[in-house]
Amino acid sequence: MKRLLTVLVVGLVALVSGCAGIPSSSSPQAIGTVERPAPPSLPKPTPDMDPDVLLREFLKATADPANRHLAARQFLTESASSAWDDAGSALLIDRVVFVETRSTDRVSVSMRADILGSLSDLGVFETGEGALPDPGPIELVKTSGGWRIDRLPNGVFLDWQQFQATYKRYTLYFVDPTGTTVVPDPRYVAVSDPDQLATELVSKLIAGPRPEMERSVRNLLDPPLKLRGPVTRADGGKTGVGRGYGGARIDLENLSASDPHSRQLLAAQLIWTLSRAGVAGPYVINVDGAPLDDRFADGWETSDVAATDPGAAPGAAAGLHALVNGSLVSLDGQRAPRVPGAFGQAPHQVSASVSRNGQDAASVVAPPGAPDPAATLWIGPLGGSTVQAMEGRTLSRPSWSLDQAVWVVADGINVVRAIRDASGTPARIPVDSSAVSSRYPGPISDLQLSRDGTRAAMVIEGQVILAGIEQTQDGRFLLTYPRRLGFGLGNSAVSLSWRTGDDIVVSRTDPEHPVSYVNLDGVNSDAPSRNLVMPVSVVAANPSTVYVADQRGVKQLSASADEENSGWVEVSPLMVPGSLPVLPG
């Protein structure tokens, strides 16, 4: 047998700083199940295709999940198509190398590639890294119609470039356990008819959250509730759904939520999911043939569910605070006076946080040279007196939950909730973080709760780790499903802060990129670095502004700043070395 070794490099998209360009909008399909025509741009096999070209085009075709990957199956022989199991998660690969051994009518190929992430059958994308383990040989045979794949590994390998062209990112919204706000659950779905977008998203809401969120959120659209039919325009038309002034009409049945607050939350899930996907209102929501709420029989608007706005910044009215020379100050124009009460008077405060309602604060006091335990946590109203909640050799920066509990990490390993009873006396309640420590051993140097209180982002030995927050029926709290975000950040993370429910800002030891962003998928990107002086330590963020502490003081970056020309701007009253920004959160 004549052997010819051919090396082909497929897909030249480089992964820059671990950052992947993720598409953000278009209309979806559930992976591998929806029966629709394939997009016209997908490749098809032709009689004159060489084996290497056919394999490359096959990887592109796997990006379309319709009809159990029918577009990709056209590249297979009948027997290979029957044997191929395309169920489950797909691996997203780049920098593919094929090594061929060929004869006249048969080619055997081994595949090497870099893994950039995975895509579950629910459309949940997570970044990854490393080399693709050998999936086994791919065999091609010569047929009357040209070369075809006759043997291939089970599972789906998605070409990264084609994934970017085919899949778009949308966000489903579920309800936090307190019924206060909505919680993002990003999904990636394949492009199809835009008039079916709303139907697909509502169907996904009814199907429920991703597995890691099932015990952290509520879903007011749980079965037995279901759609009576496709989502239409508000007037019942089937085209132009959610575009222009057409609005959207959602007809549901088997509703079990009867109280007004639950119905309001159900509407919030639908409205924020559709609105953030570009499906414009008004939103006519009917259940069992009648309006969900008679007040909105002609349609809901986002303003009707503004209390649950996922983009809102709770406690924003409290404004920016900071620790300057160890005491808490508040920004007042070009002044930064100490706040009244204990927080403004106490020295040696090394970290602090304002409560999410902007009325209370928590700070860690650590006098230099003090004997163990050296750090103490103090909680109280802004402008009032404080009580000591706990102590430890070290205590991390405090973070507030929606139920007014303060979370800290004691001694780098013990996650603790401090919560005050009706009399104001604080209780110290341990959080079960064994799922985190068993997978990511090492001290937790920073822990910050998401604004909806359902997730915790941590810095562990310079890596960004995300975990879900679950409350058991007996009232215990657990950190669950830990996973690493932002592989491109390496081990450079110092501090982090949630900018939104889906976006985390990270300060780093990297002088080229001292501040970066990472989202819930794990995709990271870099913020501007102009005007920052290393080292950059604490970061505090809200949807409108990011604040960091660098060598000279506190600087800010507006979310509306021009990306090409933006630089960090000094917060003049806080330009004191060692000053640390403090926001609600």
Curated annotation (Swiss-Prot):
Residues 24-46 are annotated as: Disordered. It comes from the Bacteria. The keyword Signal applies. InterPro entries: GerMN, Lipoprotein_LpqB, Lipoprotein_LpqB_C. A lipid is attached at C19 (S-diacylglycerol cysteine). It is found in: Cell membrane; Secreted, Cell wall. It is a lipid-anchor. Residues 37-46 have a biased composition (Pro residues). One of its GO terms (cellular component) is plasma membrane. A lipid is attached at C19 (N-palmitoyl cysteine). Disruption phenotype: Increased antibiotic susceptibility, altered colony morphology and increased aggregation, increased uptake of the Congo Red stain and increased sensitivity to SDS. Decreased gliding motility and biofilm formation. Cells are very long, sometimes branched and often polyploid. Decreased phosphorylation of MtrA, increased expression of dnaA in early growth stages. Keywords: Cell membrane, Cell wall, Lipoprotein, Membrane, Palmitate, Secreted, Signal. Pfam families: Germane, Gmad1. Residues 1-18 form the signal peptide. The keyword tRNA-binding does not apply. Interacts with MtrB, probably extracytoplasmically via its sensor domain. May modulate activity of the MtrAB system in controlling homeostasis of the cell wall and cell division. Belongs to the LpqB lipoprotein family. This is Lipoprotein LpqB. It comes from Mycolicibacterium smegmatis (strain ATCC 700084 / mc(2)155).
